[in-house]
Amino acid sequence: MYPGMLSEKRTNALPRGEIARGKSAVSRLFSQGGRLKGGFLLLIYSASRPVEQAPRIPVRVLFTVGKKLVPRAVDRNRIKRLMREAYRLEKNILTRALAFDAGKGDHQVMLAFLYRARADAIPSLERFRAEIRHMLKNLLSNRLPQTREGDRIE
C-alpha cells in the first residue's frame, strides 16, 4: 500500500507528493480533463497512467484561485488554505473508493479545484467541506471510470 494512504494513523494527511506539480501534467489536465461544476468550486479531473515522478500516488490534487476574481493575495491564500484543509478531511471518500493497489500502480487520478466565486464573503470551512464532499461523491458515482482491480482507465 501507499505509505499513510489507508493506515489508521495518518488517514487524513495530505503529503507534498499528492500536490500536483509540473507544467506539462497541469496543462494536460486543463486541456483534456472533464469538468464538474459546484456552487462556488469547479472540479477538473482526469484519470491516466501514473507520471514518472509519482508512480505510486493514486490521487494528485491542485488548488487554484484566480487573481481576477480575488484580487487580494491574502484572500487567495486563505481560500486555498481552506480548500486544502477541506480536501484533506474529505479525501478518504475518494481514496477508499479507488481501492488503489500500490504494487500495480496502474492509474492515477488528477484533480484541480478552482475557486470561481468573488471574494466578497469567503465561505467557511464547513461549506468547503460540504462542497468538496458532494463533488467527490458525484465524481465517483457518475464521472470517473471504474478503477477496481481488473478494470482499465484509458
UniProtKB/Swiss-Prot annotation:
Its EC number is 3.1.26.5. RNaseP catalyzes the removal of the 5'-leader sequence from pre-tRNA to produce the mature 5'-terminus. It can also cleave other RNA substrates such as 4.5S RNA. The protein component plays an auxiliary but essential role in vivo by binding to the 5'-leader sequence and broadening the substrate specificity of the ribozyme. InterPro entries: Ribosomal_Su5_D2-typ_SF (IPR020568), Ribsml_uS5_D2-typ_fold_subgr (IPR014721), RNase_P (IPR000100), RNase_P_CS (IPR020539). It is an enzyme of class 3 (hydrolase). Consists of a catalytic RNA component (M1 or rnpB) and a protein subunit. Gene3D superfamilies: 3.30.230.10. GO terms for molecular function: ribonuclease P activity; tRNA binding. The gene is rnpA. NCBIfam families: PRK01903.1-1 (NF002507). It catalyses: Endonucleolytic cleavage of RNA, removing 5'-extranucleotides from tRNA precursor. This is Ribonuclease P protein component. It comes from the Bacteria. The lineage of its organism: Bacteria, Pseudomonadati, Chlorobiota, Chlorobiia, Chlorobiales.
